[in-house]
Amino acid sequence: MVKTQRVVITPGEPAGIGPDLVVQLAQREWPVELVVCADATLLTDRAAMLGLPLTLRPYSPNSPAQPQTAGILTLLPVALRESVTAGQLAVENGHYVVETLARACDGCLNGEFAALITGPVHKGVINDAGIPFTGHTEFFEERSRAKKVVMMLATEELRVALATTHLPLRDIADAITPALLHEVIAILHHDLRTKFGIAEPRILVCGLNPHAGEGGHMGTEEIGTIIPVLDELRAQGMKLSGPLPADTLFQPKYLDNADAVLAMYHDQGLPVLKYQGFGRGVNITLGLPFIRTSVDHGTALELAGRGEADVGSFITALNLAIKMIVNTQ
């Protein structure tokens, strides 16, 4: 790494395990400076509950970034709206969560931070607070004014990107258009090159229907939409295989010769990845003008403050972000 960079972290839902995980992250040394966008008392209280040492130092944007020292976190303060009891949601703190996301996103956009790592949020409590919120991905897409973003989940062995994300099954076929596929594949290909350092990405593309349509007998989206798009992009030099049946694609025969899989919808690609690497997966938002990774699990309210939360996914998300920073320098 040419120089020390700052990585901003949002712990997510304050009543969940996000603050616990951030405190656990702070127990290690890191080659970047970790800047946590959160309430100071929340972090110190949670550290005390876990019996872990934690010192907070104020964020100073005009001073050089310093590598992370164990037991110390740099704090970018955002105040809670209500006091927090571990495991108990408070509706007003939905506003707090969104404020942390907005400040962290803006800091990435203006160059303060080299990457953003997000902890798990509780979408229900944010919406109950009167804030329309579908998820991190859509929030950052809108706030950064990105033209289009792509959700990708990854473990060390497998990367799965999604052509569509949070859509009902009945709407997915209509959403799979030539324009969408062109856009999604272009973003996936570009970010695999620029953020993952893969010179010539090899992408496996799932079909939409069982058996990838069985030659048109089980659906025509492959023949009418997916195959023509793949042919066009192959003619431009992209290394694309498919459309392949999703029930046979996820095996070494195909995966050993690929850098990523493009699934047509959420529950086509992610069950395999989460089974293969649950607790080690990372959510990456492609197409943003900055690096964003996230844990692949929820708030686990029942574990908050108990010292039982697994920090593995957060560590993987941070390590991946650091690698992506290096690749973009």
From Swiss-Prot:
Binds 1 divalent metal cation per subunit. Can use ions such as Zn(2+), Mg(2+) or Co(2+). Substrate binds at H136, T137, K274, N283, R292. The lineage of its organism: Bacteria, Pseudomonadati, Pseudomonadota, Gammaproteobacteria, Enterobacterales. The active site is located at the dimer interface. This is 4-hydroxythreonine-4-phosphate dehydrogenase. Gene3D superfamilies: Isopropylmalate Dehydrogenase. A divalent metal cation binds at H166, H211, H266. Homodimer. Pathway: Cofactor biosynthesis; pyridoxine 5'-phosphate biosynthesis; pyridoxine 5'-phosphate from D-erythrose 4-phosphate: step 4/5. Keywords: Cobalt, Cytoplasm, Magnesium, Metal-binding, NAD, NADP, Oxidoreductase, Pyridoxine biosynthesis, Zinc. Pfam families: PdxA. Its EC number is 1.1.1.262. It is found in: Cytoplasm. InterPro entries: PdxA, PdxA_fam. One of its GO terms (biological process) is pyridoxal phosphate biosynthetic process. Catalyzes the NAD(P)-dependent oxidation of 4-(phosphooxy)-L-threonine (HTP) into 2-amino-3-oxo-4-(phosphooxy)butyric acid which spontaneously decarboxylates to form 3-amino-2-oxopropyl phosphate (AHAP). Its cofactor is Zn(2+); Mg(2+); Co(2+). One of its GO terms (molecular function) is 4-hydroxythreonine-4-phosphate dehydrogenase activity. Its main location: cytoplasm.
